[in-house]
């Protein structure tokens, strides 16, 4: 049974489960459930024993100390998308708008064997691990390699379908040999791992130095897809030259601009509303001038403020809540049928997407035709 906590779904929270506690939209905390521990927030403390046994997605509420108010959090099951929002950042990460598009363009499936160069914080590694057959991830920085290895073991990825190796692929290539610093487990007579990759993702400062090393580790019997993740257009330019030199085709560069839009209703303001607003401004201006004149003539006393507005006979007016379409007055509930509304949208203020250029290319190493296999495919389609 797989120990990968990102590969399936569970109904109930159990002892030792990795959970993601949603405090707010910008504050999601990964927490391992242990009955004797407590999750502390600025709103209050949430004992783990009160969370264990509840269904995933539950709202956990507590009474705040010294008041009758309640604080609450939601306990969610980890997914690669939520992990991207909550993980500890060791480097810049690939956010979901980019990662989902890359996997779709490279036709990732349980059949895929993927090379990822540049493990970093492991955001994309978790997305790959959920969807592909096997992931070979490479990280040149030793401390980040050890941190990622420990994290992958804790999440059950190493025991499932992920291999991570400490290697500068720009200098040493992608071959995994016995004696290398890697999580790969070699067989008795095995001296090198067979990668046979059909998907390659390069998140490197200089992908053009790594591309020449790919021919020895990619599949020769099927179409191989490649994506280079580059922040600068100058990197793309250098990468294109090397891709052409080493026989990669169908090259295309894409930039993802993922944005979320908030939908709401806004009241339609008429010309009469605008005219009334101008009259109101003028009326208040004249009242202010009149009040300053009376103050100058010492005709206003200390009780004048309390009396407020009066009519022509000097009788105080009763204040009524009036609707003002320009922001002042009584509050009107959005969608009130007594007023006219229109649908509007507003783009989110903060865009959580690491802006980079995605360079896609494909390569077929063995272009010879296997007539026997072609005939077999044709016969199967005729049926």
From Swiss-Prot:
Q: Which GO terms describe its cellular component?
A: nucleus; tRNA (m1A) methyltransferase complex
Q: Which InterPro entries match?
A: SAM-dependent_MTases_sf (IPR029063), TRM61_C (IPR049470), tRNA_MeTrfase_Gcd14 (IPR014816)
Q: What EC numbers are recorded for this enzyme?
A: 2.1.1.220
Task: List where this protein forms a coiled coil.
Answer: none
EC category:
transferase
UniProt name for this protein: tRNA (adenine(58)-N(1))-methyltransferase catalytic subunit TRM61
Instruction: Please provide the Gene Ontology terms (biological process) for this protein.
Output: tRNA methylation
Its quaternary structure?
A: Heterotetramer; composed of two copies of TRM6/GCD10 and two copies of TRM61/GCD14.
| Natural source organism | Saccharomyces cerevisiae (strain ATCC 204508 / S288c) (Baker's yeast)
Q: Name one GO molecular function term.
A: tRNA (adenine(58)-N1)-methyltransferase activity
The UniProt function text for this chain reads: Catalytic subunit of tRNA (adenine-N(1)-)-methyltransferase, which catalyzes the formation of N(1)-methyladenine at position 58 (m1A58) in initiator methionyl-tRNA. GCD14 is also required for repression of GCN4 mRNA translation by the upstream open reading frames (uORFs) under conditions of amino acid sufficiency.
Recorded catalytic activity of this chain's protein:
adenosine(58) in tRNA + S-adenosyl-L-methionine = N(1)-methyladenosine(58) in tRNA + S-adenosyl-L-homocysteine + H(+)
Where along the chain is S-adenosyl-L-methionine bound? 94, 121-124, 139, 144, 168-169, 203
Keywords attached to this Swiss-Prot or TrEMBL record, sorted alphabetically, are:
Methyltransferase, Nucleus, Phosphoprotein, Repressor, S-adenosyl-L-methionine, Transferase, tRNA processing
Q: Which Gene3D superfamilies match?
A: 3.10.330.20, Vaccinia Virus protein VP39
Q: Does the keyword Ion transport apply?
A: no
Reproduce the miscellaneous comment text: Present with 7220 molecules/cell in log phase SD medium.
Family label: Belongs to the class I-like SAM-binding methyltransferase superfamily. TRM61 family.
Short name of one Pfam family for this protein?
GCD14
Does this entry carry the keyword Isomerase?
A: no
> Where are the Phosphoserine modifications?
302
The entry's localization annotation reads: Nucleus
């Amino acid at each position: 049974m797989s120990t990968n906590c990102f590969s399936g779904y569970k109904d109930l929270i159990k002892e030792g489960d990795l959970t993601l506690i949603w405090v707010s939209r910008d504050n999601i905390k990964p927490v391992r459930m242990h009955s004797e521990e407590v999750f502390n927030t600025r709103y209050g403390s949430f004992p783990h024993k009160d969370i264990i046994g509840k269904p995933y997605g539950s709202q956990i509420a507590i009474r705040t100390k010294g008041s009758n108010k309640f604080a609450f959090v939601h306990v969610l099951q980890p997914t690669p998308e939520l992990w991207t929002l909550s993980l500890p950042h060791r480097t810049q990460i690939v956010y979901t708008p980019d990662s989902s598009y890359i996997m779709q363009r490279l036709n990732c499936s349980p059949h895929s064997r993927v090379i990822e160069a540049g493990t970093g914080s492991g955001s994309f590694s978790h997305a790959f691990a959920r969807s592909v057959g096997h992931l070979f991830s490479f990280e040149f920085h030793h401390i980040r390699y050890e941190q990622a290895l420990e994290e992958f073991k804790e999440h059950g990825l190493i025991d499932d379908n992920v291999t991570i190796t400490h290697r500068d692929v720009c200098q040493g290539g992608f071959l995994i040999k016995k004696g290398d610093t890697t999580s790969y487990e070699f067989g008795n007579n095995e001296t090198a791992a067979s990668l046979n990759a059909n998907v390659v993702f390069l998140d490197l400062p200089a992908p053009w130095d790594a591309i020449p090393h790919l021919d020895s580790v990619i599949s020769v019997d099927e179409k191989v897809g490649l994506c280079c993740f580059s922040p600068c257009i100058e990197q793309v330019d250098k990468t294109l030259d090397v891709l052409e030199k080493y026989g990669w085709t169908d090259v295309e560069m894409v930039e993802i601009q993922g944005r979320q839009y908030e939908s709401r209703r806004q009241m339609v303001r008429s010309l009469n509303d605008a005219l009334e607003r101008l009259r109101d401004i003028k009326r208040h201006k004249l009242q202010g001038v009149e009040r300053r004149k009376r103050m100058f003539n010492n005709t206003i006393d200390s009780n004048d403020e309390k009396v407020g507005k009066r009519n022509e006979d000097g009788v105080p007016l009763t204040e009524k809540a009036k609707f003002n379409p320009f922001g002042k007055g009584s509050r009107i509930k959005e969608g009130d049928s007594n007023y006219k509304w229109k649908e509007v949208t507003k783009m989110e203020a903060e865009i959580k997407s690491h802006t980079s250029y995605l360079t896609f290319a494909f390569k077929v190493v063995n272009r010879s035709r296997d007539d026997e296999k072609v005939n077999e495919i044709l016969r199967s389609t005729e049926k």
